[in-house]
């Protein structure tokens, strides 16, 4: 009696942590190339920080009574040395930590950018994931409203470069610490009048972080939040001048905006300017980029008092918008797919593929899936499916004659017709392909 083979359980990914598959990676690469070009144009330098940081960095930097710290962080104790560690839920605190640790500001301000995965333990839904990706900028050592305006302008320029429309800018000022303290007293007094109707979340925040009550999504509390004392009415001359300076620069650059007095952001390190870029095309998760000024943070994390501002944007949400507006670029295929029939032809084809790559062409060499030689027909099907512009064909007869077959798979070859096979001397193959591709590109431009 034969023993029945035990079925091996199929493993799946963690919910809310998504694979980026080859058919989607092209869109990611398009976005990354676009944003990196923009960041270079503004003189920003790339910084890369670890995914795991000491938990204290976030409790001290973000704030202990924020949603992120209270219930969204992936934290654990390192079994090796007992350290409390956290997978980064955002990256501003880490960039600031790195700038202090490596004394990066000793010779003046820095413009930095980052890109990578962040992690938050929350219920996955459209536009909100447990592992998500952000690109962000941090302008360290710049105190004026011109720095705020510049980082906002960068976002507008990115939307234009990507072709995105309908993303609207909302701004507010959180003022200085003493202004927020005065407003906090009046806000708590106001909210206490409605203690019996506040939801559990608002009651929890009432005495710890009452500003966040203004940001409630509960429809039953909207009128209460709308009529609450406004922080902007508590701003002193310095804060007002900064906010008005920002507005003048935005207007001078034709950047429309709305002042939203309920815009407070969910991180404790902000002061003065805060802003969000929002859209109504993504349902509840309408914020695609957000940021502001965080002048106290560098000193709070052990550095010298230094002004700073920045933003972060959710890449998944922006890619969703690109798909929604049908702006995703077509996937580009390789330049050449090399097929072959016969052992001698296979060896010559392998050598030729490497020589073509030496010239900068993108080349796929047909490798056997099961170790057995594939038929010419099946190889040509693979060539067509690969998206290659040309198939280069090595057969025993061609090799004996010192020639190779070339077939245009996408556009016109030198003869002007797709799928017309031409015979080319091996030594002229590279020149022929380059000329044919130039001609095809020019035809596409017409």
Swiss-Prot record:
SUPFAM superfamilies: Class II aaRS ABD-related (SSF52954), Class II aaRS and biotin synthetases (SSF55681)
Keywords: Aminoacyl-tRNA synthetase, ATP-binding, Cytoplasm, Ligase, Nucleotide-binding, Protein biosynthesis
A Pfam family annotated for this UniProt entry: HGTP_anticodon
Any one GO cellular component localisation term in the record: cytoplasm
GO terms assigned for molecular function: ATP binding; histidine-tRNA ligase activity
Entry annotated with the keyword Plastid: no
Enzyme class: ligase
Regions that span the bilayer: none
Family the UniProt entry places it in: Belongs to the class-II aminoacyl-tRNA synthetase family.
Subunit structure: Homodimer.
Name of the molecule in the record: Histidine--tRNA ligase
Organism annotation: Burkholderia ambifaria (strain MC40-6)
Gene name linked to the record: hisS
